[in-house]
Structure formats: structure tokens, C-alpha cells
């Protein structure tokens, strides 16, 4: 290929795939430059390498550049000569990093990876136990390699005595047995993989036992993988060992005169010593025992070289630590993969402290002159030479050191339009590195624009940042067009602006837009903005005065439903007028006190209406305005501004009374200790909430002697500038309840606040929480980082690869409720998705959205306005793209608001979006200092609309007071309107007391039912007398003597066949009903007591209490993504149908039978101690929980299918994040879940050659079936050469038949092939990442040894489709600008476009970057893309 054809980068790296396989002995010799015969390294007197030693110059190349060992040839002129005296080739000393040597072994050894790493490949292949194999390899036992005519078995182990006895019995030469690696090699040589594979398949079809099947499949896998590769099994036994280049295992002379050496040299030295000794012994014809011992030691020393940690006794170094072997070099965080290949460092960068740069524009940063001078050095030198200030590089450098005047002028020129990258560690998401245009500043600190801080998560309390300089023109263009801070206005995780004002800016904007009564000039009317400005400047009106204003003709008032009219007269304040003057033309008039949320909203609005440029200007203006106004306001706060409400004491007294009341009730035995504890916590929580509410309103309406007063503390908190209600409550209200480190809540609250000061006791009880907060932070950061790493690894190769995969599947998205409140509206949950079907307005018949069209925020609002609850959209979880995802299934790129582009690395973005808040949230605990924010428990349901009551699936009994008590678990109250349509439905918990009857008319706000929030009652359904059964003290029940002197019976965790229950009998003693008692239930009746329906027999505590923060959340997220089975799982119904609970037990478990309408019966075994959620006669749906406990995602997948488990996992993840008020778009979770469900397990192989029970990628599986459909199975061969049952391609079949018929023979008959069937597997992310199709990616993640062993045996080929493999090999990643389409496209310029460009007035930016169009968008180019893989 001529130079002209190659593109601008080196084609040497342009290989498309990487293959790994076993090295043949001749390969190892071919790599080598000579045999290492001596264990010596270097001569301690001359410090020159010893000949034929481990550092020999003849083998590995010269120590000094262009100089042979003896010094006969010196200098470049002898390049390539081989010295006749010392045999060294004259060349560069760099070759000592490349040239390898070898060691010829006197006896073969087995590679430790193949027999010691579990599962043992050799053991599997030979069907031997690993322990037996080790006995043979380490010369303890003989193995029979050929029994000939004797009674011995093949592969039978014989001890020394047995071997001797057998030889005497059968005579020498009558059978063959051997030990050591030679024996293993003999056995491997005798394997015929093809027949073995057929035999195994036959055995597999015949066997019935599950374990046998598993073993056979494992063995078959290895046999087939070796058979299909070019490997021979005997290559696992080595004759020759490669020696790695000496500069990769250096020996360094220290100042003290000692040598520091790599551990590998010691390991090689042991091998060479033992090998040479073995040679001598063989030559001397030493006794067998001695030779055998030497061979064993050789095997052990080779094992230590390859993998020292797997040896029985690892070789120890000087300080009693195991030496680092070759395996340790590549695995783990410090190994080759993660330290050197994935963790490369930039060789020239600067770092310094950051300070705020309020005068910078959004795309700028301030760079200290020192840093700029150093970073831009080569560019400056080039310019100095061009301008003739310096002749040589050396003189130019001198000028730089002297800091001459010309240098500064040139520096100014060089930095224009040459962006720099700023990075702040930890870089948790892509906003951690952004590009800026540098401006030179004095001093040593980097100046950073305040608005980009949120993306970097930076503050100015001493944070440091690193500066990098993109060098090539491509890198500069990328930095400019893609990474510029102006392109990162919106967060890719949720599409909200990440560059929204905070702190002082918010405070300034809020202060200027606040209105106050009784100010100077109240009630004046103005016709234009200018008049208001004039009046304000003259002091006729104040900033907060209430005035009237006529809006300009082009502006309307901002309202939620966009109904304002243009040019209306509005009530506002001069401050708000000033704020709105700052907004660009085309925006509505925001007539409200601007809190941080409103400011963020205004930025989103601006972007949607006026585009990116206007938004950037708005951000800069908003910052200037905010800073200016907050300075002018002169806000600060004093202790007096922390207003404690006067009602505080009264609330505390009430709470204390309440606590006393509960204590008395407890003493009289009316409630359990647990109940009392919960009620006490509740009383204090109520008091605290009430005090807080009063405190906030007192601050809001703060009136001081001088009239109205803006309370600065309230202003900061309310505007969202700093400090939450939580913190103010602790300063001015009441600190409230504290948590112990266990998460339990201490029931005596802290009644004081920080302003009043804490007593010693109060201070002591708050140290718990504070300390836990700090400890948590330290521990959880690591966990969160690990989660991010696992997510990134599992999703790294998900890139947008095509426009539309053409799938017809999707997922249902709807409103998300939390309790009764709408947590996510429909518009929010479908925004940015692609609709699966077209949606038509039934009233007007207009198409709101077409099928496969993206739903914009506007369309989403229209769909919601139609009153739909759910719609179907495309999702990455059902995408059919064989690689990555397609644009339609992904939808909108959240950071730009338009359809995602091909080549976008959406997997990494998903991983960052989920992982980044994990780290954030782990760090959030300590700000509040452990004070508990316990939710007040709900204990009733109120209607939110009017309607008529319908009760569904409800079973109830009437108690003594005549109220209905609900018995069922899944009962619902539905409200219907006058047309009978359902408007609301509420799930009713067990044991709730109904306040309404069927058909009642209710109004909004009416109570439908009430319940005790702390316990679930177990109620009697019949009238009768109580008899206890299996309630045995000390075995199934414990008597709790409470402090009040009462005793309580509590059911405890029990083993064996006792099943505690309450039996209700009639007068004759006939049992009417048996009520099973679950663990932790307390019995509320006495033996022999008469009961009536609705009477409480026992109580179960409801799960409440404890503090929920994401520390509980992070492990939960990990648990979901790892698809772990929960500790104490629920049993779910396998089919729809009616429940019957059997009284007899199997193996100590109770049985629930579910009968479907079609008569299918399924038994469900329930471990004892579980609380049943269903009763006999209930109707259940498949997948519904029958007993308490967490659901198992694998069960959901098995019973109710993929969509159900997808929805479940997504919902669970979102619940954790939403409870922390972290918004993450669903699609990020969906991408990860799609990776977890990508593998299938072969159930029945059909006529394919897949292995039943093996796990594979669903697309490979689908392809295998599709290929099979192009074939035909021979049923009757006729006169053809086919045999019955073979599979042949259809074309060949037809052709052969045509030929046979032409000859007058009988054609073959064929039948359709049977496809394979498989079931979807749910894998945890770690497992999914390790099972990646790319062995390079998997090996660099975890379990390196295992992955590489497997890949080498199978001769795997890595196609380099993911990002990680390409990073490791130093290629461009196949995403973004490195994506196939962009790499292969050519740009054709349109003549007219070029002419237009040449006439347009050009900005400085465009001069340097002609690629940038007017709005920072690329200029239009027609690209002829060469398609095709």
C-alpha cells in the first residue's frame, strides 16, 4: 500500500481482531533469541551481564546503545554487525525490552493454570479428580496409561506398593503406568476429541441424573472448545519455558551497593538451577527416587513462576512475603491491565488550586501565566522561530527561561482558540472533564466559572484541578465542538440543567424578586420597563414595592398552562421588572419570587424556545445579576434571626403527656413494649413537625419594630440558596430524635436546639449519629466506586449502532404513584421516548404522535391532557440490534433534547448516571448529623375525589362495635363516577376498619378506612372457644415478662414439627377454624376464651421505624443489580387461580395449593414461621406473593416472564433513588437491565449442535436457529450419499436430489429441522461482565486467570467491538468520532457553500475552526458514507 492511500494515522495498529491460544513448543522457540543456560545474572565486580545468564547480552541485546559487550564495535556505523568475539549484535539497547529467551527443560512440566485453577481443565478433560491429578503430577502415585490385557483400569491410580505388586503379578511390560507430567502428556496424546465428543453426547442423551448431566456438559464444553480451536491438548504440558525480556524484570544497583531485583529473576533462577541439576543426575544415571524428586521440584519451581499463589507452599522472598509471579503481574488493580493499559497517565499536565472567577464568560477559565508558559511551550518555540526571534530550539528555550517580552506577546497569540481541558478528581461522570478557552491571569491559581462547579462537584475550599492541553487539530476541534463547557448545560442523567445558579446567585435573584407590603411608592402604575428603572434609580419606588405595569406587546405572563395574554397589565415589583429585563427577548414575564427551581426552569424554557446561544448568554447575565444583587442586599444573619416559635414549649408538654399516657397503658398491659415504643416515637415526630411548621411561618412573617423584615435565614433556605428546613429546624426549632449507630432510634429526643444549646446528656446522645455519619462516608465511597466500575464494565460496549432495529416489542410507561401522591407524571415518564404505536385523540381524530416518532415535552403534555394513564414506548430492554442499541429504542439524548446520534456511548453514560449519585448520596449523611427524619406513619386513607364506593376482592367480618374489619390482603376500594367509570382505586391493608359500605357516596377528603400503623391484627372469623395447639413455652413460644409486670406470649423462631396455632371450637369441641401463628406474633387471647368474629386473636408487628437513607439504599441497589436472592424470600404463585391452604405438612413445611380454572394444580411449599398473605378461597394472579418476604427476581422471570421482571427491577432501583430525591431517567436503568437479561440457557438443543444447559448470548442463539432453518434433516437417504439424520443446507440438498434424479435414482427425503429452545437467564452485573464476549474486556475486569485459561483453550478471537478492548490495545474507541460511520465517511464541499462562507463576516473562533457554524453547530456537509461491515 502506498503512503498516499494510508490515512493520517499509522496503519500498523489497524488490526481488526486479536486471537489467544496455547503456545506450541516450536512457537516458544521461534520467539526466543537463545537459550538461557546459567542462573547467574550479572557479575558483581564488573556489573556486566554474565554470558548465557539471565541478562546475557548475546541473547537479549546490548546494554549500551550501539556497543557490543566486549567493546570491539562501538558507534552507529556498525549498526547490525554481530561481534565475532562476544556474539552480540550492535543495535539499540531498547531491544532488551522486546527480545525473549527460553529454557529447555530436562523433563516436561504441566502448566499450573490448567490443573490448579478451578474448574480444573485437565481434570475435566481426562475425567480425573483434581486431587488424583495432583498426586500424579507431583510424583506421588502412578497412573495406568495403558492396561493392555491386565485387569487394571485405564486412568487407575496406583501407589508405589500397588505398582510393584502389579508388576510382579502381571510381569513387566504387560501394562503401562507412569507418573509426572510425562504420564499426563501420554494420556492427552491418546485422547481422540472427535470420538470423545460423540460418546459424551450419547451419554448425555441417556443419563437421567442431574449431577451426571452437569458433569458431562462441563466436560463436553471443554472437549468441543479445544476441538474447534487449533490447539492440541498436549500443549498444556511444557517442554520449553519462555524467558521474558530482561528490561521487564530489571536488576538495579542501589546507592548502598546492594541490588534491587524483580522477583521473577529469583523464580527463573530456581528453575535453571533445578533444571541443570536434573540434567546432571540423568547423565550420572542416578537412582530413580532422586531423579523423581528433582523432577517434582522442577515442576514446583515452574508452578511458582507462573502462579505463585496457587502453589501449596508459595516461594517466599527475603521478607517472608510470597514472590510476585507472572500471574500477579497481570491481575488485580496493580496488574498490567488496570494499572498500565486502562490507567495510562497523561505525561504533561498541570495542577493547581481553583479560585472563583466571577468575571469570566461561561466558556472561559483563567490560566496562570506560569502554567500557560509551560504547557504551550512547543507552540511558543515554533512561533519564536517563525518570527525570527530565535534560530534554534535551544535559544528559544533560553528566551522562555528569561521570560523575554516577546514571549508574552506570542503566548497571547498561541492560546487564542486553543482550548484546554480541566479535570477534577474524582471524575464520576462526563462533566468531570470540560474544555475551556484559557485567559491568562496573574498568580498561581486557576480561575473557574462559578456555574460549572456543579458539574465538577467543585467548591473553592481548596479543591485542586488538573489542566490538560489537546495537541492535534482533531483533538482541538473535538474539545471545541463537544467538550466545551457551553455544551454541557444539561445533565445526561435526567435532562435537567446542571448549570443552574446556586448559592449567592440564587439569593440575589430571590432577594430582588421578593415583594413586601407597605413600601415606598406602593400602587404606582408604569407603562414601560424604562419608567420603572428611572423611578427605581431616583428612589421613588423601592426594589420590593408592589406596582402595576403594562407588559410590552411581544411579552406575556408566564403561567403553567401558557394562558397569559400579550401586553396585559400585571401586579409586580420593580425588582421583578429588573430581573425580567435580563431575560432574552422572546421569553415570558416571570412574575414570582425566583427560587432555585424557578431559575432552573427558566433556563430550560430558554433552551427550548431560543436555543443554546441565548441560554448561554442568559446564564452569564443571570450570574452577574445574582452576584450584584446579593452584594447590594447586604444580607447576613445574627442569632436573633433564628426565630424559635413561642408554641414550642406547649408542643413539648403535649408530647410528654402523650408519652406518659402510653407508658401507663403499657403498665396496665394494654399494649406491647414495641407498640409503646412506636407510639412514643410518633408523638415526638408529630411534635417536631408541628414546631418546625410554626418556626418556618414565624420566620416568613417576621415583623420587627421597623415594619416588615425579610428574615435572611428564611430567605436563604426558602430560595434554595443554602440550608434545608432540616438544618434550620436544628438551629431554631428542636433537634428531635437521634439514631443509634445500629439505626435504632433513641426514644428520648433532644428538646433543645443549637441556639439554646444542648445539655451534656443531649450532646452525648447526638455524638452517635455524627460519628456514624463520618464512618459511613469513608466506607460507602469505596462501595459506590465499585458499583460504578461494575456498571461501566457491563455496559461498556453498548453504543448506538443503527437507526431502527425494527422490533415490535416495547414497554408500558405510566404514572408512578407513591402512596396516593403522583410521584412521576405520565408526561415526565414518556418524555424523550419513541412511541411504539401511533396515538390518536379519540375526540378530534388527530394523530398526536406517529408510531416510531419521538415524544417531545409538548407531545407528552398533549398525551397527558387526553387523560391517558399508560402508553407503550420503545425501550433498550427489547431492542433487537445485535450490537449495542438502536436510536429508536433509546430515544432522546437527555443532554441535548434531540434524538440520540449514532455512535453515542450510551452504556457508559448509563453507568455514570447510576453510579455518580451513589457516591454523592453516600457522602450526604453527615450534614444533618444523624438526627432522624422519621416519616409520620399513615394510618388512614382519605379520598381525593368524589364518587361512589365499590368494594372488590374484599372479605370482612363485623366486630363487636359493628364495624367491618378487612381480612384479605389484596382488597381494594374503588371509586366510580356517575357513569360507572373507575376514577380512583385504593389498596386496603389487612386489619383495616372500613368506614364506608358498598354503594356509599363519598366526597373528597372523607376517610374510607383506618388501621393501626404498627401492627397487623389476626382476627377471628367465627364464634367459638379458643384452644391453643403446639404453643409450648421455650419451644415455639416465649413468655415475655414486661416491666409493667404483665406477661405476653410471643411466638418464636422454631425448628421441628411443632406448628403453633389457635383452634376455635364449638361447644361440642369440634374445630371450626384453625389460625396458624407466624413468628413474632403476640397472642392477645387466653386459652378457653369465647371469641366472636372480628375479635383480635393475635398481632403481628408491621415493619416500621429505623432511618432510611441511601446507606440502606446503596447495598439495595447493588443487591438488585447483582440479582442476588434475598435472605428471606417470599413464595410466589406459579399460576393464576384459587388458593387452598392444606393443614398437613411435608418435611415440616406447610403447603399452599393454587388451582387454575383449567384445572392445573401447583403446590407451593412454605417454610414455617412465615406470615400468610392469602386465605383459602382467595383468587391470586401468577407472580403474586403468597407469604411475607422479599420477591426473588429469578422467580418473577420464571413465572411471569421478561417484561414483569424488567418492570420490577426498574421500579426497585428507581424507588431507592427517588426516596433520596435523585432523578435518573429510566432509560439508563433499562440499558443495564437489558445487559442482565441478554443471556439464554439452552433447554433443548433440537437439531443444532448447541450444548443443552449451556449459557449463551441470545443473539448467537437466535442466529443458530436461523441458520438451522436454512437446512434440512435427511429422513430417507434414497440413492444419495447422505446418511439418515444428517443436517444439510437446502441448496445442496436440492442440487444433489436433482443430480440423483437425472441419473434415474431415488431422491432423498428430508424433514424440517427442530429448533433449539432456551430460557432467558437473569445474571448479576458482575457475572454478566465476566461472561462478556470479549475476553480482553472480561480479563481486565475480574477473575483474570479463569477468563484467560478458558479463552486460550478455546482459541477465542476478540473482534474488538467494545470500548474497553480498544482502549487496552490503544485504538480509537468505536464510539463518538471513532464510530465506523465517521471514520469511513468523506466530506464533499459544496462550491456555493464555500463561496457563502468566504463572504460572511468571520468571527475569530470560526477563523480557527471553520467547522463551527453560526450556532456552534457543524456546517452542512454532504457525506458519502460507505456502509457495510
UniProtKB/Swiss-Prot annotation:
Gene Ontology biological process: DNA-templated transcription
Cofactor list: Mg(2+); Zn(2+)
Cystine crosslinks: none
Record CDD domains: RNAP_beta'_C, RNAP_beta'_N
InterPro entries, per the entry: DNA-dir_RpoC_beta_prime, DNA-dir_RpoC_beta_prime_bact, RNA_pol_asu, RNA_pol_N, RNA_pol_Rpb1_1, RNA_pol_Rpb1_3, RNA_pol_Rpb1_3_sf, RNA_pol_Rpb1_4
Residues at which Mg(2+) binds: 459, 461, 463
Residues reported in the UniProt entry to bind Zn(2+) 2: 805, 879, 886, 889
GO molecular function, a single term: zinc ion binding
Note on how the cofactor is bound: Binds 1 Mg(2+) ion per subunit. Binds 2 Zn(2+) ions per subunit.
Biased composition regions of type Polar residues, renumbered to the chain: 1419-1429
Record keyword Nucleotidyltransferase present: yes
EC number(s) given by UniProt: 2.7.7.6
Region (Disordered): 1407-1429
Residues engaged in binding Zn(2+) 1: 68, 70, 83, 86
One Pfam family from the record: RNA_pol_Rpb1_5
Keywords recorded for this protein, A-Z: DNA-directed RNA polymerase, Magnesium, Metal-binding, Nucleotidyltransferase, Transcription, Transferase, Zinc
GO CC annotation: DNA-directed RNA polymerase complex
Catalytic activity: RNA(n) + a ribonucleoside 5'-triphosphate = RNA(n+1) + diphosphate
Highest taxon above the source species: Bacteria
Biological role: DNA-dependent RNA polymerase catalyzes the transcription of DNA into RNA using the four ribonucleoside triphosphates as substrates.
Stated family: Belongs to the RNA polymerase beta' chain family.
HAMAP family: RNApol_bact_RpoC
Subunit description: The RNAP catalytic core consists of 2 alpha, 1 beta, 1 beta' and 1 omega subunit. When a sigma factor is associated with the core the holoenzyme is formed, which can initiate transcription.
Protein name per the record: DNA-directed RNA polymerase subunit beta'
Source species of the chain: Rhodopirellula baltica (strain DSM 10527 / NCIMB 13988 / SH1)
Source taxonomy: Bacteria, Pseudomonadati, Planctomycetota, Planctomycetia, Pirellulales
Amino acid at each position: 500500500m502506498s503512503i498516499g492511500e494510508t490515512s493520517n494515522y499509522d496503519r500498523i495498529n489497524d488490526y481488526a481482531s486479536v486471537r489467544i491460544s496455547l503456545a506450541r513448543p516450536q512457537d516458544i522457540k521461534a520467539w526466543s533469541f537463545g537459550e538461557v543456560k546459567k542462573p547467574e545474572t550479572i557479575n558483581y565486580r564488573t556489573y556486566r551481564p554474565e554470558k548465557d545468564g539471565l541478562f546475557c547480552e548475546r541473547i537479549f541485546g546490548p546494554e549500551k546503545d550501539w556497543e557490543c559487550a566486549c567493546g570491539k564495535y562501538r558507534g552507529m556505523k556498525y549498526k547490525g554487525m554481530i561481534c565475532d568475539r562476544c556474539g552480540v549484535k550492535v543495535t539499540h539497547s531498547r531491544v532488551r525490552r522486546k527480545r525473549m529467551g527460553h529454557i529447555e527443560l530436562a523433563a516436561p512440566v504441566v502448566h499450573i493454570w490448567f490443573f490448579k485453577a478451578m474448574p480444573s481443565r485437565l481434570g475435566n478433560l481426562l475425567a480425573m479428580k483434581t486431587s488424583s491429578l495432583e498426586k500424579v503430577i507431583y510424583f506421588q502415585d502412578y497412573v495406568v496409561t495403558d492396561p493392555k490385557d491386565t485387569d487394571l483400569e485405564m486412568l487407575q491410580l496406583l501407589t508405589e506398593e500397588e505398582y510393584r505388586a502389579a508388576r510382579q503379578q502381571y510381569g513387566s511390560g504387560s501394562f503401562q503406568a507412569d507418573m509426572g507430567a510425562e504420564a499426563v502428556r501420554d494420556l492427552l496424546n491418546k485422547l481422540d476429541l472427535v470420538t470423545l465428543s460423540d460418546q459424551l453426547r450419547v451419554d448425555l442423551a441417556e443419563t437421567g441424573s442431574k449431577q451426571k448431566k452437569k458433569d458431562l456438559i462441563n466436560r463436553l464444553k471443554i472437549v468441543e472448545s479445544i476441538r474447534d480451536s487449533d490447539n492440541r491438548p498436549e500443549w498444556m504440558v511444557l517442554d520449553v519455558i519462555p524467558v521474558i525480556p530482561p528490561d521487564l524484570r530489571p536488576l538495579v544497583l542501589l546507592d548502598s551497593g546492594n541490588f534491587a531485583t524483580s522477583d521473577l529473576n529469583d523464580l527463573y533462577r530456581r528453575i535453571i538451577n533445578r533444571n541443570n541439576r536434573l540434567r546432571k543426575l540423568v547423565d550420572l544415571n542416578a537412582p530413580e527416587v532422586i531423579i523423581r524428586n528433582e523432577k517434582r521440584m522442577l515442576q514446583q519451581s515452574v508452578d511458582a513462576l507462573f502462579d505463585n499463589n496457587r502453589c501449596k507452599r508459595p516461594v517466599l522472598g527475603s521478607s517472608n512475603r510470597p514472590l510476585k509471579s507472572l500471574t500477579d503481574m497481570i491481575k488485580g488493580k496493580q496488574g498490567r491491565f488496570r494499572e498500565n493499559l486502562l490507567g495510562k497517565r497523561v505525561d504533561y499536565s498541570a495542577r493547581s488550586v481553583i479560585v472563583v472567577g466571577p468575571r469570566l464568560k461561561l466558556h472561559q477559565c483563567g490560566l496562570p501565566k506560569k502554567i500557560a508558559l509551560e504547557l504551550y511551550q512547543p507552540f511558543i518555540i515554533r512561533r519564536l522561530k517563525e518570527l525570527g526571534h530565535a534560530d534554534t530550539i535551544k535559544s528559544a528555550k533560553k528566551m522562555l527561561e528569561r521570560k523575554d517580552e516577546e514571549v508574552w506577546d506570542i503566548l497571547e497569540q498561541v492560546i487564542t482558540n486553543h482550548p484546554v481541558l480541566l479535570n477534577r478528581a474524582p471524575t464520576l461522570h462526563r462533566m468531570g472533564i470540560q474544555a475551556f478557552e484559557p485567559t491568562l491571569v496573574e498568580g498561581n491559581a486557576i480561575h473557574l466559572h462559578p456555574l460549572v462547579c456543579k458539574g465538577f462537584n467543585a467548591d473553592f475550599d481548596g479543591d485542586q484541578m488538573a489542566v490538560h492541553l489537546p495537541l492535534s487539530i482533531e483533538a482541538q476541534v473535538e474539545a471545541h465542538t463537544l467538550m466545551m463547557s457551553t455544551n454541557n448545560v444539561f445533565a445526561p442523567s435526567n435532562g435537567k440543567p446542571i448549570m443552574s445558579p446556586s448559592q449567592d446567585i440564587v439569593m440575589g435573584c430571590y432577594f430582588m424578586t421578593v415583594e413586601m407590603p407597605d413600601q415606598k411608592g406602593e400602587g404606582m402604575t408604569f407603562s414601560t420597563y424604562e419608567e420603572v428603572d428611572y423611578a427605581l434609580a431616583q428612589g421613588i419606588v423601592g426594589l420590593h414595592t408592589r406596582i402595576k405595569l403594562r407588559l410590552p406587546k411581544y411579552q406575556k405572563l408566564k403561567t403553567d398552562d401558557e394562558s397569559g395574554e400579550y401586553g396585559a397589565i400585571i401586579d409586580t415589583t420593580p425588582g421583578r421588572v429588573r430581573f425580567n429585563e435580563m431575560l432574552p427577548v422572546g421569553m415570558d414575564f416571570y412574575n414570582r419570587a425566583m427560587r432555585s427551581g424557578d431559575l432552573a426552569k427558566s433556563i430550560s424554557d430558554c433552551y427550548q424556545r431560543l436555543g443554546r446561544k441565548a441560554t448561554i448568554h442568559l446564564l452569564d447575565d443571570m450570574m452577574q445579576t445574582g452576584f450584584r444583587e446579593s452584594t447590594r442586599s447586604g444580607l447576613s444573619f445574627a442569632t436573633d434571626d433564628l426565630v424559635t416559635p413561642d408554641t414550642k414549649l406547649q408542643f413539648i408538654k403535649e408530647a410528654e403527656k402523650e408519652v406518659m399516657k402510653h407508658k401507663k397503658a403499657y403498665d396496665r398491659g394494654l399494649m406491647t413494649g414495641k407498640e409503646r415504643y412506636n407510639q412514643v416515637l410518633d408523638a415526638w415526630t408529630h411534635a417536631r413537625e408541628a414546631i418546625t411548621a410554626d418556626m418556618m411561618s414565624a420566620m416568613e412573617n417576621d415583623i420587627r419594630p421597623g415594619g416588615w423584615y425579610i428574615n435572611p435565614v428564611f430567605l436563604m433556605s426558602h430560595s434554595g440558596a443554602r440550608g434545608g428546613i432540616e438544618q434550620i429546624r436544628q438551629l431554631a426549632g428542636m433537634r428531635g430524635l437521634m439514631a443509634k449507630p445500629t439505626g435504632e432510634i433513641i426514644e428520648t429526643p433532644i428538646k433543645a436546639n443549637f441556639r439554646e444549646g444542648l445539655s451534656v446528656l443531649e450532646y452525648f446522645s447526638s455524638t452517635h449519629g455524627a460519628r456514624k455519619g463520618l464512618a459511613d462516608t469513608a466506607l460507602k465511597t469505596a462501595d459506590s466506586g465499585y458499583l460504578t466500575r461494575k456498571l461501566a464494565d457491563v455496559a461498556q460496549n453498548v453504543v448506538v449502532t443503527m437507526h431502527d432495529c425494527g422490533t415490535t416489542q416495547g414497554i408500558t410507561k405510566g404514572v408512578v404513584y407513591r402512596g396516593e401522591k403522583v410521584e412521576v407524571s405520565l408526561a415526565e415518564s414518556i418524555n424523550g421516548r419513541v412511541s411504539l404505536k401511533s396515538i390518536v385523540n379519540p375526540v378530534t381524530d388527530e394523530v398526536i404522535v406517529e408510531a416510531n416518532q419521538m415524544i417531545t415535552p409538548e407531545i407528552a403534555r398533549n398525551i397527558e391532557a387526553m387523560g391517558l394513564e399508560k402508553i407503550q414506548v420503545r425501550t433498550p430492554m427489547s431492542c433487537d440490534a445485535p450490537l449495542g442499541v438502536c436510536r429508536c429504542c433509546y430515544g432522546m439524548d437527555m443532554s441535548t433534547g434531540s434524538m440520540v446520534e449514532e455512535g453515542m456511548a450510551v452504556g457508559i453514560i448509563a453507568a455514570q448516571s447510576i453510579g455518580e449519585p451513589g457516591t454523592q448520596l453516600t457522602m450526604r449523611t453527615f450534614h444533618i448529623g444523624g438526627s432522624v427524619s422519621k416519616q409520620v406513619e399513615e394510618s388512614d386513607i382519605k379520598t381525593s375525589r368524589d364518587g361512589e364506593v365499590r368494594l372488590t376482592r374484599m372479605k370482612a367480618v363485623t366486630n363487636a362495635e359493628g364495624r367491618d374489619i378487612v381480612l384479605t390482603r389484596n382488597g381494594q376500594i374503588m371509586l366510580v363516577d356517575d357513569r360507572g367509570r373507575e376514577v380512583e382505586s385504593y389498596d386496603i391493608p389487612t386489619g383495616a376498619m372500613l368506614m364506608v359500605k358498598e354503594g356509599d357516596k363519598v366526597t373528597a377528603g372523607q376517610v374510607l378506612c383506618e388501621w393501626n400503623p404498627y401492627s397487623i391484627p389476626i382476627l377471628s372469623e367465627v364464634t367459638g372457644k379458643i384452644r391453643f395447639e403446639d404453643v409450648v413455652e421455650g419451644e415455639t413460644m416465649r413468655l415475655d415478662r414486661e416491666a409493667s409486670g404483665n406477661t405476653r406470649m410471643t411466638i418464636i423462631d422454631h425448628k421441628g414439627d411443632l406448628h403453633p396455632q389457635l383452634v376455635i371450637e364449638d361447644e361440642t369441641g369440634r374445630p371450626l377454624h384453625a389460625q396458624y401463628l407466624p413468628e413474632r406474633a403476640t397472642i392477645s387471647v387466653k386459652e378457653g376464651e369465647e371469641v366472636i368474629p372480628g375479635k383480635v386473636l393475635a398481632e403481628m408487628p408491621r415493619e416500621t421505624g429505623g432511618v432510611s437513607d441511601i446507606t440502606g439504599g446503596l447495598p439495595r441497589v447493588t443487591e438488585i443489580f447483582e440479582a442476588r436472592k434475598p435472605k428471606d424470600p417470599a413464595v410466589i404463585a406459579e399460576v393464576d387461580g384459587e388458593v387452598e391452604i392444606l393443614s398437613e405438612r411435608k418435611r415440616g413445611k406447610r403447603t399452599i395449593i393454587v388451582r387454575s380454572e383449567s384445572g392445573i394444580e401447583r403446590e407451593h411449599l412454605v417454610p414455617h414461621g412465615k406470615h400468610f398473605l392469602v386465605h383459602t378461597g382467595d383468587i391470586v394472579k401468577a407472580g403474586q406473593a403468597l407469604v411475607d418476604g422479599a420477591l426473588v427476581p429469578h422467580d418473577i422471570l420464571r413465572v411471569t416472564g421478561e417484561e414483569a421482571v424488567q418492570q420490577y427491577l426498574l421500579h426497585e432501583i428507581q424507588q431507592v433513588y427517588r426516596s433520596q430525591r435523585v432523578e435518573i431517567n429510566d432509560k439508563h436503568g433499562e440499558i443495564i437491565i437489558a445487559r442482565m437479561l441478554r443471556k439464554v440457557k439452552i433447554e433443548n438443543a433440537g437439531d443444532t449442535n448447541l450444548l443443552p444447559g449451556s449459557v449463551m448470548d441470545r443473539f448467537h442463539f437466535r442466529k443458530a436457529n436461523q441458520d438451522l432453518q436454512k437446512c434440512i434433516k435427511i429422513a430417507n437417504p434414497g440413492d444419495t450419499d447422505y446418511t439418515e439424520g444428517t443436517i444439510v443446507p437446502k441448496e445442496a440438498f436440492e442440487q444433489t436430489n436433482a443430480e440423483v434424479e437425472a441419473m434415474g435414482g431415488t431422491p432423498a427425503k428430508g424433514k424440517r429441522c427442530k429448533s433449539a429452545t432456551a430460557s432467558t437467564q437473569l445474571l448479576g452485573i458482575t457475572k454478566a461482565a465476566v461472561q462478556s464476549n470479549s475476553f480482553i474486556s472480561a480479563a481486565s475486569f475480574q477473575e483474570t486467570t479463569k477468563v484467560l485459561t478458558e479463552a486460550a483453550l478455546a482459541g477465542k478471537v476478540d473482534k474488538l467491538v467494545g470500548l474497553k478492548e480498544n482502549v487496552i490495545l490503544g485504538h480509537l474507541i468505536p464510539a463518538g468520532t471513532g464510530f465506523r460511520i465517521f471514520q469511513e465517511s468523506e466530506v464533499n464541499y459544496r462550491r456555493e457553500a464555500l463561496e457563502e462562507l468566504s463572504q460572511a463576516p468571520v468571527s475569530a473562533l470560526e477563523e480557527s475552526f471553520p467547522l463551527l457554524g453560526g450556532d456552534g453547530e457543524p456546517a452542512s456537509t454532504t457525506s458519502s458514507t460507505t456502509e457495510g461491515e
